[in-house]
Amino acid sequence: MQMLAFMPYTFGSMSLGKNPADVAQDLAVVRRAMEAGVWFHSSPTYNQGFTFMVLRFAFDENRSQVPKMVIKVRDASVPLIRFEVEDSCRRLGLDAIDVAQLVSMDQRPGNLLDQLRGGGGPLADELASLRARGLIRQAVLFLTPENSDAAVEATKSGLIEGVTLYWNACQRDCSHTAWAAIREQGIPALALRTLGGGPSDQFSSAKSEELAEMLKTAGCRNATEFNLRLAASEPAIRTTIGGTASLAHLEDYLKAATNAAPLSADILQRVEQLQIR
């Protein structure tokens, strides 16, 4: 499965555009990420669409530095998937989406996953058409614990290059069998929610003490370094997507991504137990 080449860190844009009346700081962060040459991850729905506004402002300042992008695309119906792809390209001034993160909004039988596994259907045909038109270069499927087995099977379709999932020191959002298949088959995986600022939600906060102890044992200066090293330790993970609206935090991400050394086998074993607990 030949996926486009990623850098270890991908800039997540979810925090941009929260205050659309004043985007000066957001623009400074985007400019620095563009200068660094990292991939970007975004969605047309972030912050009621104002995230795309910030990105477009920055892109139009220097079109020569427009990054490669992973963009969320909802795939519940033919009109929806077509609209989201065409609209994202129009709003950001892009010729194509480099990697479409296909997010299923339809769990009923016959959805996109079923069509990819079963030999076709209108959604799979539309995805093929968008690729043939050059509007989508590659595509990955978003995993959840409920759909991960089916999604991994669907990657055998010629329309899919890999998967995305929430994956970090506290979380691995797929079944044990799906994760084993990802590793064994070499399916490229993009990790969402780096936890570069440490535990940020109720689920990961419940594991914060154990994470802090592992961070100390590994000799990492902070959670950003630990989680970039964790991603570098797992061959299946092609990049980890970490969001920030802080210039200092972005610099920390970029520093941590430079020659990130894999963690020890002992630490990795402890991380795996924490992920699945």
Question: Model features per residue range: what roles?
Answer:
Residues M1-K68, E126:
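N-terminal binding-site loop/beta-alpha segment at the start of enzyme catalytic domains
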Residues G17-V23, S43-M53, R74-I81, R108-P109, ...:
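Acidic-and-aromatic substrate-binding clefts and catalytic sites of carbohydrate-active enzymes
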Residues S42, I71, A189-A191:
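Hydrophobic residues in well-ordered beta-strands that form the structural core
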Residues Q65-S77, V99-V103:
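A short, structured active-site edge motif that brings together acidic residues
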Residues C89-Q115:
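Active-site groove signature of glycoside hydrolases
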